[in-house]
């Protein structure tokens, strides 16, 4: 799993999407979390080139979940990556695993009012550091890259949009990071995407690493 804080935090509790995924694959495959909080595609790509030993050379599956920081604005502009560069970086990251099953998770929607509240509570600013429509551009671009490269897509942006009923706050802890309810949505989405795109990698299709006793 290659990503930012949305992936890193997936191990924060037993109900995190990464924790649940690892549990579903126990004794069948190791789920390796390479989520780097605060990282964008530029910094992740640089890390993959400078420290390749951090990343498995021939994994069974690669999941790339990046874009939330690339789409940063206002007082978090230092994290921002222009859309054209984001597309280029995503292609390059995916091309590092050309002969491996790959899935792209799109960045999820942003709850701007909750990001404003978060900024007011944690910084001297009263503006959001992410914007809904701006992040949507990165989600659309991520999906397009995946489709063009023939890899799987887990469209988190669209999935949350269909669930929210106009208010998505319950799925996020601060308008950006997932609540337990949001973690469950991402877990269900990635499991369904694996089953649909690469069914032979679904946990129930993999053999146990040793006999049962």
State where each predicted segment sits.
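Catalytic nucleophile-elbow at a beta strand-turn-alpha helix junction centered on a G-D-S/GDSL motif
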Residues: 1-12, 39, 71
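Short glycine-centered, acidic/aromatic-flanked micro-motifs in structured strand/loop junctions
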Residues: 3-4, 33, 66
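Short beta->alpha junction loops
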Residues: 33-40
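Alpha-helical cap/lid subdomain in secreted, periplasmic
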Residues: 15, 19-30, 43-213
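Conserved donor-binding loops in enzymes that form glycosidic bonds
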Residues: 4, 36, 176
């Amino acid at each position: 799993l290659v990503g930012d804080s949305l992936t890193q935090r997936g191990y924060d509790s037993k109900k995190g999407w990464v924790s649940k995924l690892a549990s579903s694959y126990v004794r069948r495959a190791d789920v390796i979390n390479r989520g780097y909080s605060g990282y964008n595609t530029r910094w992740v790509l640089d890390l993959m080139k400078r420290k390749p030993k951090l990343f498995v050379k021939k994994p069974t599956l690669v999941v790339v979940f990046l874009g939330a920081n690339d789409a940063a604005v206002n007082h978090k502009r230092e994290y921002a990556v222009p859309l054209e560069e984001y597309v280029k970086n995503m292609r390059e990251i995916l091309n590092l695993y050309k002969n491996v099953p790959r899935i792209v998770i799109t960045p999820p929607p942003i709850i701007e009012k909750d990001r404003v509240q978060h900024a007011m509570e944690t910084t001297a600013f009263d503006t959001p550091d992410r914007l809904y429509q701006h992040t949507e551009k990165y989600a659309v671009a991520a999906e397009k890259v995946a489709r063009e490269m023939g890899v799987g897509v887990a469209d988190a942006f669209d999935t949350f949009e269909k669930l929210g009923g106009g208010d998505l706050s319950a799925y996020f802890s601060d308008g950006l990071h997932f609540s337990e309810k949001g973690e469950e949505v991402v877990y269900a989405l990635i499991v369904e995407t694996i089953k649909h795109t690469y069914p032979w990698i679904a946990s129930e299709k993999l053999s146990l690493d040793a006999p049962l006793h």
